[in-house]
């Protein structure tokens, strides 16, 4: 992500760094691959629970007198919080259930494994859940179930909601597809491919924030578990709540950081495609990642070939920075010595052009004097007139030279 000090530097490449040493594009690819692995594990876990429920016996799931089982499932809940789009679904796997809640009479239930812990409960079954019925949890089918507990005037109210694991598999599969789409877009420099997973991240961040706020404002299931626990308690409910809240806040900060990293990668790809203001990020600056970056460049080159080599041409233009040509007006003007070496008649018109001009002028004069003569007389008169004009010009030139020569020697020009 961009740092405040990096924004003040002149090198634009330092504006898009994450994890102190990675480029946002490399960080996005690593984050996407990690998410793909976690989601594949989560999908495998759901399939095992769906098709082979005996692998996860329900008598050990969330048992109130088994601290190890509860700790294991709460750790599993913390791991699933790292997966976008399943923050709400994984709660059904990790909430502490009550495996031996059975109907004793209309108003009394046996709670836990000890007959001395009989507590009055009031069932509040919502009409929106058709499958919501009071059941014996020890013989319940393999379904993902979550219980919400709350205190109301000295009594506890249990709302049993049953979820189908197929919905969780579908949602996680869509999230996995969008994550693969994001990795493909980051490798092939397609910025629009990052947007679907980015929106999932935004939605998941909002869900986590609401969950943390709900944990702070209401009685949590962890406090209820500690309050009703029959075995020894080694930690206070306040300390445990503080630990869980701290871990949740750290996960929320991590998700926000990953969200900003994906957004910076999107901005980097858009700037690199539209304006070409960013130079290529070379791996020689970070030698530890040279092998990994060489593999990514191979995929990037294949993506550029599919798009018509448009980006490669832009990169070549960006890398080459030729110096601008300066215009010097003195280079266009010839030197004075070169002009003096040019002969006087160097730019004279060709002879045939001069003869044509003189012939046309004499013909005009002859036509003005002898308009009624024949063509033969016109030709003769033209030749005679040309000779006379030449003689007159020579005489005038000699006369001017004689006048210049006869000028007194004591007269000096001004």
UniProtKB/Swiss-Prot annotation:
- Give the top-rank taxon of the lineage listed in the UniProt record for this protein: Eukaryota
Report the transmembrane regions from the record.
29-49, 167-187, 195-215, 242-262
GO cellular component annotations, sorted alphabetically?
Answer: lysosomal membrane; plasma membrane
* Stretches for region Disordered: 306-328
What does the record note on quaternary structure? Answer: Interacts (via N-terminal extracellular domain) with human C2a.
Q: What more does the entry say? A: Potential vaccine candidate molecule.
Q: What is this protein called?
A: Tetraspanning orphan receptor
